[in-house]
Amino acid sequence: MSDKRQDYISWDEYFMAVAKLAGMRSKDPNTQVGACIVSEDNKILSMGYNGFPRGCSDNEFPWAREGEMLDTKYVYTVHSELNAILNFRGGSLEGAKLYVSLFPCNECAKAIIQSGIRTVIYDCDKYSGTDPVIASKKMLDAAGVKYRKYEPTNRELIITV
């Protein structure tokens, strides 16, 4: 009888890697965010990434970050967390975990809370001092949704496709 392999990746590494891989589908030239929703028994339920709604051309809608509001991406983009929630096609997300590469904004926090997701594991919190993230944390705390920073292992995962 042989011993099992010891260098397999942890659940956290696996799901955060899946979230980051999903983010690689984003066509946003500045910000690629991915999300992966996982059941209490570690089954992937849904994934999402930031981008425009279905039917809204990536070539016709703006990717700009500055300018008149209607000439920027901000009023058109669906965030990865909301896409993952909307992409879920079965049952309930009650008790699920959300792995996401960037801390959720206030609008995504509302959807997270309403969907029943109970835990958020995030990689980056670079907007922590902004009103949307402060509001997000306030709502998540009030609703009893736990959140924690992903602890990177700096393990290099190489995938050839």
Please name every model-derived segment.
Residues 1-161:
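Zinc-dependent deaminase catalytic domain
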